[in-house]
Amino acid sequence: MKAILSDTDPAKGCEPITCTRALGEVSLANQPLAELQRKRLVKAGFALSTTGTARDLFVRNDAWLSAAILSDLRQIGGPAVLRDAAGVALAWIGDPAQAAKTLTPDKESFLIRHPWDLLAIHEQVMATIQDGRIEGDVSPMATVEGVLILGKGSRLLPGVFVEGTVIIGADCKIGPNCYIRGATSIGDGCHIGQAVEIKNSIIMERTSIGHLSYCGDSIIGSHVNFGAGTITANFRHDGKTHRSMAGGQLLDTGRRKFGTIMGDHVHTGIHTSLYPGRKLWPNTSTLPGAIVKTDLHG
């Protein structure tokens, strides 16, 4: 059976990450989302195609489907549709309006509408990585506990501590004396420096988080610079799930830990503090000592 990623016009909601790139170009685990979708379809036994018939599977390109759901769709073979709770067809075989069988998404399958959906996909993908690969240089005074993929030309300096599943791209300088943990991916040409902690985050290419900073449960775009002492808060005092503005509405993210979403070319002044769930649009900046309580639009 063939599978076709069907082009859609996704509703706004994944900004500011998608202000400067298409949704399928967003880097998760240092791979474009569209490539991860294609790999998942192939692994489920589908042949990729750009055209298909009523016997083939069509998947929205802004939908993320679990391996289990893809297996179910492949076994059904005949007319069927996968609809979410809002009635949106995420995938279908034949005419979705006349499908004989309707499936319901599991917890790992959903329409990608908001930045926190991208974090959820990133966590799923990182959890499947079992083997590390070292193509750069690791100081004997660095510690790696977990799975590390380190790209060519990258260096882990003394005092670096890595745990969990971490991907670091090519030509990065990591350290000295920093802590990287959780499901974290760091793009090519990044600098993570002295006394910095990165936890469960996506850091895109050419970004610098040089010193005395914390970045947790966040998505940071490319060519971003953290001024010294920049802190992304990610936990509510009452322990409830975070809410974040999207499309003019305050939405529950479903996440107890949720940091900051930054677009490309953002610069923070020294000692900037960011409330959880706040978003900074591309090319915005903060002054030294700023407290970011609301989204910053360009």
Locations of regions flagged by a protein language model:
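Acidic, glycine-rich loop-and-beta core segments that form the ion-binding/anion-interacting portion
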Residues: 150-203, 207, 214, 218
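Conserved short-loop catalytic and cofactor-binding motifs
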Residues: 22-25, 106, 142, 160, ...
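Terminal amphipathic alpha-helical/low-complexity segments used for targeting or macromolecular assembly
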Residues: 1-137, 283, 289
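A charged, amphipathic alpha-helical module
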Residues: 124-147, 152-158, 164
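Residue-level recognition of short loop/turn positions
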Residues: 9-11, 60, 86, 153, ...
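Glycine-rich hexapeptide-repeat left-handed beta-helix
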Residues: 194-195, 200-298
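Short, surface-exposed helix/turn micro-motifs that flank interaction/cofactor sites
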Residues: 35, 155, 173-175, 225, ...
